[in-house]
Amino acid sequence: MVKLALVVAEFNYDITHLMLQKALEHAKFLGAEVTYVVKVPGVFDIPMVLKELALKEDVDAVVTLGAVIQGATKHDEIVAQQAARKILDLAVESGKPITLGIIGHGANRMQALERVEEYARRAVEAAVKLARRKKLLKEAKYGGSTVVID
């Protein structure tokens, strides 16, 4: 069974709370166990807890959930781009899947609400698939014919 940690931004919590509910439902549907749910103030703060979660033995993958709503300035672009870059850096550094379930940048509140289920489900599904496939890859051995991990 894949063990997941979920990191949820509290900013725009009317949206991210719904994302959390959908993510928990989809994890259960896929047969994954959610071992941690960590709430952080905003999307920009998500990377602050990722390394700690990735080091835990009872976490196979981490799902990030957040919503960056377009404002009057370019602030949403900076937040979303920097968070996404650091999330990927930490995934590569830790060797554990950390998936991006962050709506935005450029989305307005209505668009974000329309994308809640899609983004939450995709992030959970990617985390579960990556965790399972990494385990299969670790156990796989080449024996003269192509090894396919799917």
Curated annotation (Swiss-Prot):
A molecular-function term among this protein's GO annotations: 6,7-dimethyl-8-ribityllumazine synthase activity
Catalyzed reactions per annotation: (2S)-2-hydroxy-3-oxobutyl phosphate + 5-amino-6-(D-ribitylamino)uracil = 6,7-dimethyl-8-(1-D-ribityl)lumazine + phosphate + 2 H2O + H(+)
Binding site for (2S)-2-hydroxy-3-oxobutyl phosphate: A72, T73, R115
SUPFAM superfamilies found in the cross-reference section: Lumazine synthase
A Gene Ontology cellular-component term: riboflavin synthase complex
Keywords, comma-separated and alphabetical: Riboflavin biosynthesis, Transferase
Gene Ontology biological-process annotations: riboflavin biosynthetic process
UniProt KW Cell membrane keyword: no
Residues that, per the record, bind 5-amino-6-(D-ribitylamino)uracil: F11, V43, F44, D45, A67, V68, I69, L100
Pathway: Cofactor biosynthesis; riboflavin biosynthesis; riboflavin from 2-hydroxy-3-oxobutyl phosphate and 5-amino-6-(D-ribitylamino)uracil: step 1/2
Keyword Transferase: yes
EC number, UniProt record: 2.5.1.78
Active site: H75
Pfam family name, one: DMRL_synthase
HAMAP family for this protein: Lumazine_synth
Functional summary from the UniProt entry: Catalyzes the formation of 6,7-dimethyl-8-ribityllumazine by condensation of 5-amino-6-(D-ribitylamino)uracil with 3,4-dihydroxy-2-butanone 4-phosphate. This is the penultimate step in the biosynthesis of riboflavin.
Family membership noted in the UniProt record: Belongs to the DMRL synthase family.
Name listed for the protein in its UniProt record: 6,7-dimethyl-8-ribityllumazine synthase
Organism expressing this protein natively: Pyrobaculum calidifontis (strain DSM 21063 / JCM 11548 / VA1)
